[in-house]
């Protein structure tokens, strides 16, 4: 199916389409390297998240005025919104070193004890994916956060002895994409909790102009707006698309990104005007063309697009639901009227009638 600038621009995908997604918000190796160069150094330079920035600024300024370590901070939100960047800014604002680790890397209480015992006074410990930490380590963290002390168990069985280990005051910055998985005793020990929201297009345009300047890439307002509109409200995706459009501009044009260059480049990379890629369109295309818009079960839909059900449910569906293109109902997955319009298709009469109860006439 061919499509214009507002809809699909390539043929329908066939077979698995998960590899190398430009619109995946999780960081890859290239992202990690480039983000270090693009990362803001302080709160004033950080774009977006106005409420979190304002509140965090007060917390950090108050801590500096008291000459104390900052309260423990919990940052929640989808991948790619700036949680790691904010943790580094917290350390910079407090003029403190930062130690970075992740929940999956701490599978035993001893792993955590080794990290905590090596911290310097005032150091910031950034714990990414804190919800994936093991339960024994989690329970040790309670005491460390509240009393700056841990009990290290020496020996086994009846002869085991708990030896208290005093810790220097430190600031824990926890990051999670699933705050609901954190037990209340852990959540309650954070002095400040900030939820990271998806970015508005205007905020992403500011991110893109700043990144383009640092990458020495020319970009005009319309070019930035075109990329921002396809970036799913996520700075990491915006910066990734910017790099790919930059490549196209260097090879196919004179290096400056305007609207036409951005559209042509993103057509090559199969990211459409709403930020859908091949996997998203495969799911919607199967739902509309093979199943008349649904309802259809998740497993059946996954087979139709040649992907695992977990891939469809965890990778494609969240964005489609957020965009109002797909609904999860007790009877199965159902396409919305917006999905039909986006792919330029007309819903069958029985599909439209069957969906009235969900979406109106």
UniProtKB/Swiss-Prot annotation:
Region called Large ATPase domain (RuvB-L), residue ranges: 13-199
One Gene Ontology term, aspect cellular component: cytoplasm
Major place of residence: cytoplasm
InterPro entries, sorted: AAA+_ATPase, AAA_lid_4, DNA_helicase_Holl-junc_RuvB, P-loop_NTPase, RuvB-like_N, RuvB_C, WH-like_DNA-bd_sf, WH_DNA-bd_sf
Catalytic activity: ATP + H2O = ADP + phosphate + H(+)
One of the record's GO molecular function terms: ATP binding
Biased composition (Acidic residues): 1-12
Small ATPAse domain (RuvB-S): annotated segments: 200-270
One GO BP annotation of this record: DNA recombination
Compartments it resides in: Cytoplasm
Annotated DNA binding sites: 309, 328, 333
Binding-site residues, Mg(2+): 84
Keyword tags: ATP-binding, Cytoplasm, DNA damage, DNA recombination, DNA repair, DNA-binding, Hydrolase, Nucleotide-binding
Binding of ATP, residues: 38-39, 80, 83-85, 146-148, 189, 199, 236
EC number(s) from the headed UniProt entry: 3.6.4.-
Region (Disordered) location: 1-21
Region span, Head domain (RuvB-H): 273-361
NCBIfam families: PRK00080.1, ruvB
Domain notes: Has 3 domains, the large (RuvB-L) and small ATPase (RuvB-S) domains and the C-terminal head (RuvB-H) domain. The head domain binds DNA, while the ATPase domains jointly bind ATP, ADP or are empty depending on the state of the subunit in the translocation cycle. During a single DNA translocation step the structure of each domain remains the same, but their relative positions change.
Homology family: Belongs to the RuvB family.
Functional summary from the UniProt entry: The RuvA-RuvB-RuvC complex processes Holliday junction (HJ) DNA during genetic recombination and DNA repair, while the RuvA-RuvB complex plays an important role in the rescue of blocked DNA replication forks via replication fork reversal (RFR). RuvA specifically binds to HJ cruciform DNA, conferring on it an open structure. The RuvB hexamer acts as an ATP-dependent pump, pulling dsDNA into and through the RuvAB complex. RuvB forms 2 homohexamers on either side of HJ DNA bound by 1 or 2 RuvA tetramers; 4 subunits per hexamer contact DNA at a time.
Subunit structure, interactors included: Homohexamer. Forms an RuvA(8)-RuvB(12)-Holliday junction (HJ) complex. HJ DNA is sandwiched between 2 RuvA tetramers; dsDNA enters through RuvA and exits via RuvB. An RuvB hexamer assembles on each DNA strand where it exits the tetramer. Each RuvB hexamer is contacted by two RuvA subunits (via domain III) on 2 adjacent RuvB subunits; this complex drives branch migration. In the full resolvosome a probable DNA-RuvA(4)-RuvB(12)-RuvC(2) complex forms which resolves the HJ.
PANTHER family per the UniProt record, alphabetical: HOLLIDAY JUNCTION BRANCH MIGRATION COMPLEX SUBUNIT RUVB, PTHR42848
The protein's name in its UniProt record: Holliday junction branch migration complex subunit RuvB
Organism, scientific name: Streptomyces griseus subsp. griseus (strain JCM 4626 / CBS 651.72 / NBRC 13350 / KCC S-0626 / ISP 5235)
């Amino acid at each position: 199916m061919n499509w214009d600038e507002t809809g699909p621009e390539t043929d329908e995908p066939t077979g698995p389409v998960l590899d190398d997604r430009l619109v995946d918000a999780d960081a890859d190796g290239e992202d990690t390297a480039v983000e270090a160069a693009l990362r803001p150094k302080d709160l004033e330079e950080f774009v977006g998240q106005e409420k979190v920035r304002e509140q965090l600024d007060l917390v950090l300024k108050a801590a500096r005025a008291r000459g104390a370590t900052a309260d423990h901070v919990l940052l929640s939100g989808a991948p790619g919104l700036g949680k790691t960047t904010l943790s580094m800014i917290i350390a910079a604002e407090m003029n403190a070193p930062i130690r970075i680790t992740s929940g999956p890397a701490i599978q035993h209480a001893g792993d955590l004890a080794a990290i905590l015992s090596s911290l310097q006074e005032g150091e910031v410990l950034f714990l990414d994916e804190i919800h994936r930490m093991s339960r024994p380590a989690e329970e040790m963290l309670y005491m460390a956060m509240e009393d700056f002390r841990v009990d290290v168990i020496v020996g086994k069985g009846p002869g085991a002895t708990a030896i208290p280990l005093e810790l220097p005051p430190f600031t824990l910055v926890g990051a999670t994409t699933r705050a609901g998985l954190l037990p209340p005793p852990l959540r309650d020990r954070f002095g400040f909790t900030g939820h990271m929201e998806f970015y508005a297009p205007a905020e992403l345009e500011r991110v893109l102009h700043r990144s383009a300047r640092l990458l020495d890439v020319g970009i005009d307002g319309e070019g930035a707006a075109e990329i921002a509109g396809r970036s799913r409200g996520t700075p990491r995706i915006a910066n990734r698309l910017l790099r790919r459009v930059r490549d196209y501009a260097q090879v196919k044009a004179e290096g400056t990104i305007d609207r036409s260059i951005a559209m042509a480049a993103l057509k090559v990379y199969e990211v459409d005007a709403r930020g859908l890629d091949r996997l998203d369109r495969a799911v919607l295309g199967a739902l509309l063309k093979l199943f008349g818009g649904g309802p259809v079960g998740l497993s059946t839909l996954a087979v139709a697009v040649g992907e695992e059900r977990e891939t469809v449910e965890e990778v494609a569906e969240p964005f489609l639901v957020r965009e109002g293109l797909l609904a999860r109902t007790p009877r199965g997955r159902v396409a919305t009227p917006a999905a039909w319009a986006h792919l330029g298709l007309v819903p069958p009469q029985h599909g439209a009638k069957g969906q009235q109860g969900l979406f109106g006439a």
